[in-house]
Amino acid sequence: MKFDKYKYREDFVFKDNRICLTYQGLRKLYKPKKLTGSRIGGVLGSDSYKTPFQTWCDIMGFFKEDLDPYFLEAGRIIEPKLKEYAELQIGKSFKSYDPPSIKYDLFSSNDVFGGVPDGEEFDANGNIVSILEIKTAQLDKYKWVFKDNQFRLFTEDGKPVVSQTGGGLVKWFKNGEVLIPESYKDQLSLYLYLRGITVGYFCVAFLRNEDYADPHSVKFMSPFNKYLNDGIVSEEGDHILIWKKFEIDLKEFEKKVHVAKQWYEDHVRKAISPPMTSKDLEWFRYGYPDLEH
C-alpha cells in the first residue's frame, strides 16, 4: 500500500482528529471518486473491512492498494461462466456491461453515486425489471498476514494456505438460512434505487482451492440452493450455488441514500475527512509516520 499522492502539511493538515485538504491538495484531487455499490457500505457502516475514514481516503485517492491477484483473477474468469450457467438454470437473461467501454460507470449523469451492476434484466418493452449481483465466495478460510498496511495471502511454495476447510461458509449460513452480508445488500440496493426498481437477485458460488488454482477449468453442474444446514453439499465435487431473490422498499432505502449523500457533501465536497478512530490513525500513519498528535 502506498500513500504517495498527497504531502503532509503541503496538501493536507491534521486537525481535530480529521484530515483537511489545503488549496494545494485540492488542486491535486482533480476529481474525487463516486460512491459505488462497493463503497457505500463503508459509509453506512455495513462494510466490516472498511471504515468511513478509509472509504474517504479511497474516494480522495490517498492510497494505492496492492490487490492480490489470486482471487481477483479467478473471479474475473469465473463470474461470466457463473452468469451464463445461472441464466440457463433459472431461465432469465441479464445484460452485462464492459466496464472500460462505459468508463466504469453506468450512472454517469449522477454526480454522487455510480458503478456497474453485474447484469440487468429487461422486459419485452425494454424496461429494466431486475438487477443481478454475482459473488464468487471462498469455500475455505485462508491464512492471511498483515504486511505493508494491508492483509495479504500467506503462501507456501507459491501457493495460498488453507487454514480451515469450509471455513468460508460461516458468514453465509445460520440455522439453514442463507445470510447475505449487509454490505452486499447495500450494494445491490443502491443499484436498484438508482434504476427505480425493487427486485434483484444474488447469484453466489463458493469456490474451492482447486478452482482458484485453475479457474479456466471450472465448470458448474450443481443445482442452485442444494445444501444442508451448514452449507455443505451432499455430493462430493459439487459446487455450493446460491440463487436468492432480493427486494427493497425504495422509500425505506432512500433514507440510507440521503445519509450517504449528506456524508459525501460534508466530507468529499468540503474535503474534510470523517473523524478517525484509533485504528484509522494507526492505519494512516503507515503512510505519514510524522503525523502529529
Residue ranges and their predicted role:
Residues M1-H293:
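Accessory terminal regions of nucleic-acid processing enzymes
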